[in-house]
């Protein structure tokens, strides 16, 4: 029998020095990680007899063990705390869900450099601009640059193997340097202008282009003057959209907003005085957190736990926290750079701050409204199915293939708050007759529910199958074979017209058939989940089919493994170009001998 946790005995031996504490439940699962200037005083606040917030009380009720680590100072405690949170992601901590690296615009080296999106380590030679807060923001900038300055964005392998201009040249998005249709000096000038834009020097760029336009007009080069006029027009349109532009500094404007339903942190990224975009974060909040606690947790995880992330010279925030000096010191220790955190600001910076607050508030409101909308649909489904309470987990399965090729099954999961994307799964189907959807579904469900015996995964309340009586019957057979506990089975078959709103539903067995009105919230939920499963299956199938078609003809060649196959395709710019190459041309590729080139050629041209 486990000995109950004794707070008094624990506190009597607890140190009053700075450090980190870790709270565990009776099964030794980490519940919460915190830091303190005085460990004893901080931990004592959890075990007072009254005045605890409900979520804090729920945490304390689960505590079976507390461990502490004494540190030399608060800065060391903060660094250790962030390391532990990132590694263990305790359920009662505020957790930043999106930990992906941010994208940059990358300009490669060379005579005709390329603009592209880059994530991760900066290993390639060239210039990096950013970071941008989202892929959408960076694609918008690249699209503008392509329309304005025509710098190529194609892969190097594609560029090196062109024999005639591609479609981008035809629609005036590129000057075709691949086939020598642009003078190197002219291209270099376009690259220089692109760099000026990416560095935030839009005003200087516009002035330079205006001067060039006047000069072209004075020499009667009206075609060149018209081209420059169009470039200036595009740039001024962007400048009008970026009303927040000002100064030349690098600033992140961050606002946190909290209400009983959750929290949102909105970040506006300004680099070189130019707004690159913004992004919403919805941290998983643990115990009842004040807005300042959410802000401190966000800054710690965003800038301290991810030292590879770009660091501006200043943060403008809407709330202050007593840990900010410690945070600044920790960042200086990690990166050797100074950081200013500003709260009371004026003028343009105050407008930035207020805009971030407004965005955070509106984003959280929209998220909660959508959550309530989804929850209402779950309530409606429970009513339709005569359930005592709304289901908490729905799984839907679908199959996608092209005439039996590259068959993929999808599993999507929804809860009362919407899709649970971390639980989505795809299954590559093997060993079944091409086009046999029943066998494919049987394999997918067998693989999914076999894992329950090993304690993996969660049992859904409702299992949706995109199909009619046959698919539903097959799903029931799989569950019976695996002795899966009773759960609700729901088959969704398209009506005779195959239009949304005319679906036929089958509950548990094919004998229980019914339909719902087109405006039924329950039907809308079923359609939403079904369509998401369909989308997830199709994207998986297309990726698998594309990979198969690119590589299958090379997979049987001895001496051509995955790495060499990838290098070959990259060298020639694709399988089609490789198929056109002669034996001598193939032999010139890195790592390919004459004998291996003959084998590759024979394989590509066999009947």
UniProtKB/Swiss-Prot annotation:
Recorded superkingdom: Bacteria
Short name of one Pfam family: GIY-YIG
HAMAP family given in the database record: UvrC
Assigned keywords, A-Z: Cytoplasm, DNA damage, DNA excision, DNA repair, Excision nuclease, SOS response
UniProt keyword Ubl conjugation present: no
GO CC, any one term: cytoplasm
Functional description taken from the UniProt entry: The UvrABC repair system catalyzes the recognition and processing of DNA lesions. UvrC both incises the 5' and 3' sides of the lesion. The N-terminal half is responsible for the 3' incision and the C-terminal half is responsible for the 5' incision.
Assembly description: Interacts with UvrB in an incision complex.
Stored Gene3D superfamilies: 5' to 3' exonuclease, C-terminal subdomain, GIY-YIG endonuclease, UVR domain, UvrC, RNAse H endonuclease domain
Cell compartment(s), UniProt: Cytoplasm
Protein name per the record: UvrABC system protein C
Domain UVR: 203-238
């Amino acid at each position: 029998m486990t000995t109950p946790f004794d707070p008094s005995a624990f506190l009597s031996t607890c140190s009053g020095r700075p450090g980190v504490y870790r709270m565990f439940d009776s099964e030794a699962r980490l519940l919460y990680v915190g830091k303190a200037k005085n460990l004893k005083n901080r931990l004592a606040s959890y075990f007072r007899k009254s005045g605890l917030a409900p979520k804090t009380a729920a945490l304390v009720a689960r505590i079976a063990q507390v461990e502490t680590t004494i540190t030399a100072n608060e800065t060391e405690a903060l660094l250790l705390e962030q390391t532990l949170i990132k590694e263990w992601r305790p359920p009662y901590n505020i957790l930043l869900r999106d930990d992906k690296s941010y994208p940059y615009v990358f300009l490669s080296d060379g005579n005709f450099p390329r603009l592209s999106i880059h994530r991760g380590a900066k290993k390639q030679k060239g210039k990096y601009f950013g970071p941008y807060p989202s892929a959408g923001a960076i694609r918008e900038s690249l699209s503008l640059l392509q329309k304005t300055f025509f710098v190529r964005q194609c892969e190097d392998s594609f560029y090196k193997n062109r024999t005639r201009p591609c479609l981008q040249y035809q629609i005036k998005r590129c000057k075709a340097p691949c086939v020598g249709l642009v003078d190197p000096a002219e291209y270099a000038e376009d690259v220089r202008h692109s760099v000026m834009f990416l560095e935030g020097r839009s005003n200087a760029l516009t002035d330079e282009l205006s001067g060039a336009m006047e000069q072209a007009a004075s020499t009667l080069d009206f075609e060149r003057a018209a081209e420059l006029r169009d470039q200036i027009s595009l740039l001024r349109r962007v400048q009008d959209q970026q009303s927040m532009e000002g100064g030349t500094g690098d600033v992140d404007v961050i606002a946190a907003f909290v209400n009983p339903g959750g929290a949102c942190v909105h970040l506006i990224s300004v680099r070189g005085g130019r707004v690159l975009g913004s992004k919403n974060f919805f941290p998983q909040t643990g115990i009842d957190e004040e807005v300042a606690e959410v802000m401190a947790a966000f800054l710690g995880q965003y800038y301290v736990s991810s030292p590879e992330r770009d660091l501006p010279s200043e943060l403008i925030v809407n709330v202050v926290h007593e840990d900010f000096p410690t945070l600044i010191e920790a960042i200086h220790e990690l990166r050797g750079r100074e950081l200013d955190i500003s709260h009371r600001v004026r003028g343009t910076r105050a407008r930035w701050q207020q805009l971030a607050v407004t965005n955070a508030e509106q984003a959280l409101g929209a998220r909660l409204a959508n959550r309530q909308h989804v929850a209402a649909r779950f309530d409606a489904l429970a009513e339709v199915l005569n359930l005592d309470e709304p289901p908490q987990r729905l799984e839907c399965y679908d199959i996608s293939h092209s005439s039996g090729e590259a068959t993929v099954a999808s599993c999507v999961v929804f809860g009362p708050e919407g899709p649970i994307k971390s639980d989505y799964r795809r299954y590559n189907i093997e060993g079944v007759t091409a086009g046999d959807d029943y066998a494919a579904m049987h394999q997918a469900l067998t693989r999914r529910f076999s894992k329950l015996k090993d304690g993996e995964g969660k049992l859904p309340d409702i299992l949706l199958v995109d199909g009619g009586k046959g698919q539903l019957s097959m799903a029931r057979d799989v569950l019976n074979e695996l002795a899966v506990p009773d759960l609700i089975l729901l088959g969704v078959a398209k009506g005779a017209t195959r239009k949304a709103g005319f679906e036929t539903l089958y509950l548990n067995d094919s004998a229980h058939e019914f339909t719902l009105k087109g405006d039924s919230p329950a039907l809308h939920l079923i359609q939403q989940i079904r369509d998401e499963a369909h989308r997830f299956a199709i994207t998986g199938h297309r990726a698998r089919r594309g990979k198969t078609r690119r590589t299958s003809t090379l997979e049987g060649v001895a001496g051509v493994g995955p790495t060499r196959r990838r290098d070959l395709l990259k060298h020639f710019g694709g399988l089609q170009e490789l198929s056109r190459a002669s034996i001598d041309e193939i032999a010139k590729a890195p790592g390919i001998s004459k004998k291996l080139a003959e084998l590759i050629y024979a394989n590509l041209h066999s009947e």
